[in-house]
């Protein structure tokens, strides 16, 4: 079983525990993409990424600072910040939980393709949904689709052949479902506010991180046990779920 998360635009170089780090599987491909970006002007980067002047300057700085050698950067699970990652308490994981995460948790990435928690990464801004011309086509999905799907298929060999999708639509689209050699379960979080149930993005992101953290803490290997997730008041709704789309909801407290 594997769990997939989307990355975060917010990234910081953290103070990390003394852990043995690993190298991204597609470091060479990350270097190729960075070279494509490096050849672009500031104006082209701004148009491609729809960024402000300051964000464009920061992005260019990261592109120019990128080093494709092994051993560069910081572990992904500690580098990504933001709503989803606020719920991931990797600094509190014990050795067994970190080992589980390294085996079962994956972070999709526009630059690196797919990352394990302890894979070293450098700060970057490259979203999966961008239209970036490469030798594979005009979209990032064409560049990464087969590579990521093949990697997931290979890593699903251990235990239940099930992919738990805690990612966003933009990132999970990269997976070629027809070629996926296993079951993919989409996790949907809804929030009840003013008597109406709907998905509010900021709360959904936080819930994805909290569920990923729950899976690591409990070292879950049976997807059925996910239905016990109850953080922040969420509960599984069997009547609104299907075999491959599981719905959880919570009621937001009035303020």
UniProtKB/Swiss-Prot annotation:
Belongs to the UPF0246 family. GO terms for cellular component: cytosol. This is UPF0246 protein DP0358. Signal peptide: none annotated. InterPro entries: YaaA (IPR005583). Transmembrane segments: none annotated. One of its GO terms (biological process) is response to hydroperoxide.
């Amino acid at each position: 079983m594997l769990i997939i998360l989307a990355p975060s635009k917010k990234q910081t170089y953290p103070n990390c525990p003394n852990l043995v780090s690993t190298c991204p599987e597609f470091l060479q491909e990350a270097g190729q993409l960075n070279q494509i970006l490096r050849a672009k002007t500031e104006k082209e980067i701004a148009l491609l990424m729809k960024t402000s002047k300051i964000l464009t300057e920061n992005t260019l700085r990261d592109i120019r600072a990128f080093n494709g050698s092994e051993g560069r950067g910081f572990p992904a699970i500690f580098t990504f910040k933001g709503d989803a990652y606020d719920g991931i308490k990797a600094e509190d994981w014990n050795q067994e939980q970190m080992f589980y995460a390294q085996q079962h948790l994956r972070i999709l990435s526009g630059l690196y393709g797919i990352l394990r928690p302890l894979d070293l990464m450098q700060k970057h801004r490259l979203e999966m949904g961008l239209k970036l011309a490469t030798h594979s086509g005009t979209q990032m999905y064409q560049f990464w689709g087969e590579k990521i799907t093949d990697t997931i298929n290979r890593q699903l060999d251990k235990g239940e052949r099930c992919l738990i999708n805690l990612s966003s639509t933009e990132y999970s689209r990269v997976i070629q479902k027809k070629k996926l050699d296993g079951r993919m379960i989409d996790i949907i979080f809804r929030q009840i506010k003013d008597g109406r149930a709907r998905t509010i993005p900021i709360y959904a992101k936080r819930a994805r991180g909290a569920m990923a953290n729950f899976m690591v803490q409990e070292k879950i290997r049976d997807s059925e046990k996910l239905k016990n997730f109850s953080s922040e008041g969420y509960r599984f709704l069997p009547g609104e779920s299907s075999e491959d789309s599981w719905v959880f909801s919570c009621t937001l407290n009035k303020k």
